[in-house]
Every structure is written in structure tokens, then in C-alpha cells.
């Protein structure tokens, strides 16, 4: 048996924060605002995994009201979510994701993101895809006010 999950996240870009996407620290004049490290890509993937296993969402497992998750490393949250998915009888098969950001250019960092995600999920890097897109200068994404992430994953019964 297989299950598909879909995840989404968006965070505002602000000065004075690091920009971390896919567990990679990306040089930029702004970073993402959030309770944790605000890694929108890993949050979307975490939601996709939890959703596919019918385990709710990232906010249910790692609430932004909990002090223990203040400044949390989203890679640690992804690994914990994957452990909970496995405990529920499922295993990740693949992940496909999209980052939407007008700036910075993400292509130079995609391979490192894929490697981090694959390592955290126990997958071959060939089972993880990350695409970078712009919003063609339209809307809040096009004005560089935020970065958005979308993800889908496939789980197989363990």
C-alpha cells in the first residue's frame, strides 16, 4: 500500500535572520521569520510526510507556542517526524519539492539541500528532488517579501 502527502509553508523575509532552506545556510541580506529556524522547505516536507501517514501536521507535533521549539533546527524536526511516520508503519519512498523565491538564486544550493533531506530521511539522493522557481516578480513573493515551499511525498507500508 502507498500513500501520498502534500505540504506547504511560507515565511516572511526579514532583516537580521539567517536564511536556511533545506538545512543549508544561504548567504542573503534577509532571512525567514519564524519560531524555529523557519526553514520553509523542510517544514513543507515535514507536513507532507505527516499528512501522508495521517498524523496531522507540523504544528500539532512541534507547536510554535512551545518554548522547546524556539530556534529549533528544522532538520531535527524532519528526522523526528520521519521517526514518527516509521513508528506508524510507513517508510518514505521519495520527495518532490518546489521553492518559490524571487531572490536569492537557489540553484547553487539545490544539491546540498537534496543531500541533507536524503540523509535525514534515510533515502538515496536520487529519491529527493528540489526545484527553485521565481514568481516572475508578481505578488508578495515577487516583491521579495517571503519564500514559499511546496512538497509532495510518497510513503510505502513498512
Curated annotation (Swiss-Prot):
Its cofactor is a divalent metal cation. A divalent metal cation binds at residues 9, 11, 43. PROSITE patterns: ISPF. Binds 1 divalent metal cation per subunit. It catalyses: 4-CDP-2-C-methyl-D-erythritol 2-phosphate = 2-C-methyl-D-erythritol 2,4-cyclic diphosphate + CMP. The record marks 35, 134 as: Transition state stabilizer. Its EC number is 4.6.1.12. NCBIfam families: ispF. Homotrimer. Involved in the biosynthesis of isopentenyl diphosphate (IPP) and dimethylallyl diphosphate (DMAPP), two major building blocks of isoprenoid compounds. Catalyzes the conversion of 4-diphosphocytidyl-2-C-methyl-D-erythritol 2-phosphate (CDP-ME2P) to 2-C-methyl-D-erythritol 2,4-cyclodiphosphate (ME-CPP) with a corresponding release of cytidine 5-monophosphate (CMP). Belongs to the IspF family. This is 2-C-methyl-D-erythritol 2,4-cyclodiphosphate synthase. It comes from Chromobacterium violaceum (strain ATCC 12472 / DSM 30191 / JCM 1249 / CCUG 213 / NBRC 12614 / NCIMB 9131 / NCTC 9757 / MK). The gene is ispF.
Amino acid at each position: 500500500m502507498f500513500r501520498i502527502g502534500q505540504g506547504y509553508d511560507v515565511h516572511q523575509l526579514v532583516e537580521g535572520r539567517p536564511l536556511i532552506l533545506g538545512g543549508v545556510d544561504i548567504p542573503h541580506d534577509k532571512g525567514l521569520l519564524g519560531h524555529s529556524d523557519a526553514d520553509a522547505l523542510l517544514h513543507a516536507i515535514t507536513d507532507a510526510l505527516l499528512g501522508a501517514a495521517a498524523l496531522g501536521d507540523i504544528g500539532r507535533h512541534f507547536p510554535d507556542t512551545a518554548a522547546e521549539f524556539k530556534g529549533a533546527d528544522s532538520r531535527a524536526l524532519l528526522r523526528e517526524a520521519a521517526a514518527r511516520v516509521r513508528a506508524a508503519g510507513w517508510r518514505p519512498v521519495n520527495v518532490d519539492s518546489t521553492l518559490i523565491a524571487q531572490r536569492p538564486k537557489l540553484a547553487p544550493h539545490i544539491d546540498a539541500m537534496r543531500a541533507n533531506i536524503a540523509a535525514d530521511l534515510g533515502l538515496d539522493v536520487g529519491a529527493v528532488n528540489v526545484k527553485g522557481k521565481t514568481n516572475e516578480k508578481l505578488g508578495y513573493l515577487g516583491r521579495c517579501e517571503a519564500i514559499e515551499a511546496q512538497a509532495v511525498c510518497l510513503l510505502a507500508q513498512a
